[in-house]
Amino acid sequence: MGVTGILQLPRDRFKRTSFFLWVIILFQRTFSIPLGVIHNSTLQVSDVDKLVCRDKLSSTNQLRSVGLNLEGNGVATDVPSATKRWGFRSGVPPKVVNYEAGEWAENCYNLEIKKPDGSECLPAAPDGIRGFPRCRYVHKVSGTGPCAGDFAFHKEGAFFLYDRLASTVIYRGTTFAEGVVAFLILPQAKKDFFSSHPLREPVNATEDPSSGYYSTTIRYQATGFGTNETEYLFEVDNLTYVQLESRFTPQFLLQLNETRYTSGKRSNTTGKLIWKVNPEIDTTIGEWAFWETKKTSLEKFAVKSCLSQLYQTEPKTSVVRVRRELLPTQGPTQQLKTTKSWLQKIPLQWFKCTVKEGKLQCRI
């Protein structure tokens, strides 16, 4: 029943469980009773959670911050769809917050956009902000756009995740994943809660086989970036391009790239050659691979936490993470509205607590 049943899955199934299941396993080792019970595909608030929420959160030392990628929510990750979630705006200062652990990302993005006059659209990354460290595919977009604003923000309030730092804005030429920052509550402060230390980074992580990590950069050219008339081209080489469509998966683009090279269908002049893909061609190749590693259950399930009640000003919502299924006849799912996140409303000051007349009183 419940969590215990999950923990008895065969060994090969463990490899395909998602981040949330590992969170449950880690908590299972921390507590003597289960963190939650899964019933009707819904993770219910457990007695442990209620206990922690009632009177045990005495210091932010008990919080562990985790970056969660939006692609786990089933949002469309192709470049045309993803870029529609971002927009330029002035008058809002950028915010940066750190997080301690995160997921590996299937899709990351890297933008180099200029205005028509040649000036830069995006600010350079401040000192200490490095690219997201674990991306299977990096979608590198170069091009031009009006860029009507000082910074590029996420229209739905999510963060841009960098290397253990999450920012509200996009930095020039710095790889990021879309996500939010969540907090795990521990019964007491634990320094060694995350037992796996960060991998020792080789000089070039993408080529060192010992790192067990491989990343592929896919290049695009954009015109009218950030407008409703944006046009994207997938770059085969500096003179050969393919018109980009939302239905193209990274695996399909890589196969397309290989086909252009081996079949000799590249530009052999000084002019630009642009190909268009036949609408009847199935482009869903490889889409299952990512979701096999991300899936948690075959149906939707919700994760509830008392943290949402600490500084809640809007109606309470649950964060829903769902596996997206694609049939052979379907293209990628349309852009989904991500849940408005209360995670960003949690103040990051220290809690100062004292016991007065037998009651725990905390102030910020």
UniProtKB/Swiss-Prot annotation:
What are the annotated GO cellular component locations?
extracellular region; host cell membrane
Q: Which InterPro entries match?
A: GPC_FiloV, GPC_filovir-type_extra_dom
Q: What does the record list as GO biological process?
A: monoatomic ion transmembrane transport
Q: Which residues are glycosylated?
A: 40, 204, 228, 238, 257, 268
> Does Signal appear among the keywords?
yes
What highest taxon heads this organism's lineage?
Viruses
Which residues are listed under the site Cleavage? Answer: 324-325
Can you list the disulfide-bonded cysteine pairs?
Answer: 108-135, 121-147
Q: Which terms does the record give in the GO molecular function aspect?
A: channel activity
Which family does the entry's similarity section mention? Belongs to the filoviruses glycoprotein family.
Q: What is the lineage of its organism?
A: Viruses, Riboviria, Orthornavirae, Negarnaviricota, Haploviricotina
The species this protein belongs to is Zaire ebolavirus (strain Gabon-94) (ZEBOV)
User: Pfam families, per this entry?
Assistant: Filo_glycop
Transmembrane regions: none
Q: Which UniProt keywords apply?
A: Cleavage on pair of basic residues, Disulfide bond, Glycoprotein, Ion channel, Ion transport, Secreted, Signal, Transport, Viral ion channel
Signal peptide from the UniProt entry = 1-32
**Tagged with keyword Glycoprotein:** yes
Q: What is this protein called?
A: Pre-small/secreted glycoprotein
